[in-house]
Regions:
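N-terminal Rossmann-like or analogous alpha/beta NTP/dinucleotide-binding catalytic cores
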Residues: 1-124
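Active-site cores that bind ATP or allylic diphosphates and position pyrophosphate for catalysis
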Residues: 93-224
Length: 224
């Protein structure tokens, strides 16, 4: 999903623009208390990028935690955005709903951490810090781009024209359905086909993909 929706586009863009690709190691939720796992994940992401053709000679790989200005700008921008605006963010609403109402059938509800409210602000900071003009995203990330544009406008009105209002660039595949039929393929939902998967694992996942409700042999499948 990440390849079809983002990486494929990034490989092309790196030869035409000055590009910065972010490894967002601050933005973890499932294992934020496991530092080794976070560090290992950083390497895995970088290796995936190299494997698909991203070239450090043509673009910059940025590890979020190694640039403290990301956290600093997040703090400053937090003073310009009302909580009500963040609560309307559809991605934030979906993630919070998933934590409060688990889809795996368990009755245990995860408490929503404060960081979930600052998560969209940090994404805004990640875009504004390098003063990005064009941001390659999937369809589900468009609300984040609009939030970034609104934040830039508020900041520029308060002070002076510092941040450009970035434009979104949606790739060839705007949104890829998960292997379980969920509207979005996502690692957090465990419905992905990973770049590092073996041929046997890929075959198993493909054969087990959700193709819609039971139908007759002559009826086409349909996933909404």
């Amino acid at each position: 999903g990440h390849y079809a929706g983002a990486l494929e586009n990034w490989v092309r863009l790196q030869h035409d623009y000055e590009t910065y690709f972010l490894i967002a190691d601050y933005q973890v939720s499932d294992y934020a208390d496991d530092i080794k796992r976070v560090r290992d994940a950083v390497w895995e992401v970088a290796l995936d990028w190299l494997a698909v053709g991203l070239d450090p000679e043509s673009s910059s790989f940025v590890i979020e935690s190694l640039v403290p200005e990301h956290a600093e700008l997040t703090t400053w921008l937090g003073w310009f955005l009302p909580v009500s605006m963040l609560e309307r963010n559809p991605t934030l609403k979906a993630e919070m709903a998933a934590m409060e109402n688990p889809e795996d059938g368990s009755q245990e509800r995860k408490p929503v951490p404060v960081a979930f409210y600052t998560y969209p602000v940090m994404q805004v900071a990640n875009i504004l810090l390098p003063r990005a003009h064009l941001v390659p995203v999937g369809e589900d990330q468009l609300p984040h781009i609009e939030l970034t544009r609104e934040t830039a406008r508020r900041f520029n009105r308060r002070f002076k024209e510092i941040f450009p209002e970035p434009e979104a660039l949606v790739g060839r595949v705007a949104r890829l359905v998960g292997t379980d039929g969920n509207a979005k393929m996502s690692k957090s939902r465990g419905n992905t086909i990973d770049l590092k998967d073996s041929a046997e694992t890929v075959a198993k996942k493909v054969k087990g993909m959700y193709a819609g409700p039971p139908r007759g042999a002559t009826e086409p499948g349909l996933v909404e």
